[in-house]
């Protein structure tokens, strides 16, 4: 399903380079990191605009649980929430000269918070349906797990949102933590019709 950019009316011009992210995305992924058992999950990401010079972002990840033998006979409760985060995507008002951006790229910032006690600022580049981010700052509550650095990659591939998240945490070097493949919810609705 081809993606049509939203009507720019009401969308701040500052966020035009991020417009392809807008909408609700749903799909699956996997988490695997030293000390964390490999697990499959489902995810919903919602990226929206209220007209300001930013896009709001929420993500909910639920672990996939094997259905019980009686699943066909009764309604199963939703899978447990494993992780949530929320934040904002922004394009800085001035183009940084020290980020190594190409002419086709725009600077981008992602500010995220999660209930496990972390707030992070990621900085990077957006261009040609790809976003590369590295952590600029990660702050944690005293009770939050030790995460010292992170990298994120988002890409629009054949109309799907692919992402990967690497972290350095618990004394381990930077390595793959989680990844996902999501489809635009509107495209899922069209396919089901």
What is each residue range found by the language model?
Residues 1-54, 58-81, 158, 170-193:
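Amphipathic/hydrophobic helical signal segments and adjacent flexible N-terminal regions
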Residues 26-28, 99, 123, 149, ...:
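Feature targets compositionally biased, intrinsically disordered low-complexity regions
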Residues 35-142:
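Central antiparallel beta-sheet cores of small beta-barrel/beta-sandwich binding domains
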Residues 87-90, 152, 180-183:
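Conserved hydrophobic/aromatic positions in well-ordered beta-strands
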Residues 115-169, 188-192:
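Acidic/His-leaning functional-site neighborhoods
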């Amino acid at each position: 399903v081809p993606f049509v950019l939203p009507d720019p009316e009401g969308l701040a011009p500052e966020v035009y380079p991020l417009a392809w992210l807008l909408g609700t995305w749903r799909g699956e992924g996997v988490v695997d990191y030293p000390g964390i058992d490999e697990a499959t999950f489902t995810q919903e990401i919602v990226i929206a605009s209220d007209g300001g010079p930013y896009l709001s972002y929420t993500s909910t990840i639920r672990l996939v649980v094997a259905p019980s033998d009686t699943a066909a006979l009764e309604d199963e409760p939703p899978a447990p929430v494993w992780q949530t985060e929320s934040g904002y995507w922004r394009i800085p008002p001035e183009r940084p000269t020290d980020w190594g951006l190409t002419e086709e790229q725009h600077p981008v910032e992602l500010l995220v918070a999660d209930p496990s006690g972390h707030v992070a600022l990621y900085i990077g580049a957006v261009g040609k349906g790809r976003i590369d981010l590295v952590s600029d700052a990660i702050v944690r509550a005293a009770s939050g797990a030790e995460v010292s650095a992170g990298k994120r990659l988002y890409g629009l591939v054949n109309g799907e949102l692919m992402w990967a998240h690497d972290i350095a945490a618990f004394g381990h070097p930077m390595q793959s933590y989680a990844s996902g493949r999501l489809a635009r919810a509107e495209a899922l609705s069209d396919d089901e019709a």
